[in-house]
From Swiss-Prot:
Subcellular location: Plastid, Chloroplast
Protein's name according to its UniProt entry: Large ribosomal subunit protein bL31c
Domain of life the protein comes from: Eukaryota
Organism: Arabidopsis thaliana
Cited InterPro entries: Ribosomal_bL28/bL31-like_sf, Ribosomal_bL31, Ribosomal_bL31_sf
GO MF term set: rRNA binding; structural constituent of ribosome
Subunit structure: Part of the 50S ribosomal subunit.
GO biological process: translation
Function description: Binds the 23S rRNA.
Length: 144
């Protein structure tokens, strides 16, 4: 399933539009008559990007998750490989998702606490359990 993401920022043309600047109109007075001289329009182009410094931008970059094409977007690489995307992440799926547990974390836990299983066994007691009685405290007051 391929999903195209429209993004107005990514669709901007990389070329900066040219700015047209007009020279001011100059007025000259000849013999009491005012004549106007107009200068020709000049085009000034301003670019802030240095050539061969910025990465090439690909309009149709493909995003793969578990070997399946999940969306098409723009980016500096032709294709991206991701482990989690909004289609399989529990945060976005809500009640439809199963609990996602990373197997590596479970294995780390088992390795770390493998030796504690012998210590952590709870002994089974047989017979009566006798609780010690509490000692009564003396009357409250000042001692002399």
């Amino acid at each position: 399933m391929a999903v195209s993401l429209p993004n107005s920022f990514l669709q901007i043309s990389p070329c900066v539009p040219s700015l047209q600047l007009r020279k001011p109109v100059m007025a000259a007075v000849k013999g009491g008559k005012q004549s106007v001289r107009r200068s020709s329009n000049t085009v000034v182009q301003i670019t802030c990007r240095k050539k061969e410094l910025h990465p090439e931008f690909h309009e149709d970059a493909k995003v793969y998750c578990n070997g399946e094409l999940v969306m098409t977007t723009g980016g500096t690489k032709k294709e991206y490989v991701v482990d989690v995307w909004s289609g399989n992440h529990p945060f976005y799926l809500g009640n439809r998702s199963a609990l996602m547990v990373d197997a590596d974390q479970v294995e780390k836990f088992r390795k770390r606490f493998a030796g504690l299983s012998e210590i952590m066994e709870i002994p089974v007691l047989k017979g009566e359990i006798i609780m010690p009685t509490k000692k009564s405290k003396g009357p409250k007051g000042k001692k002399k």
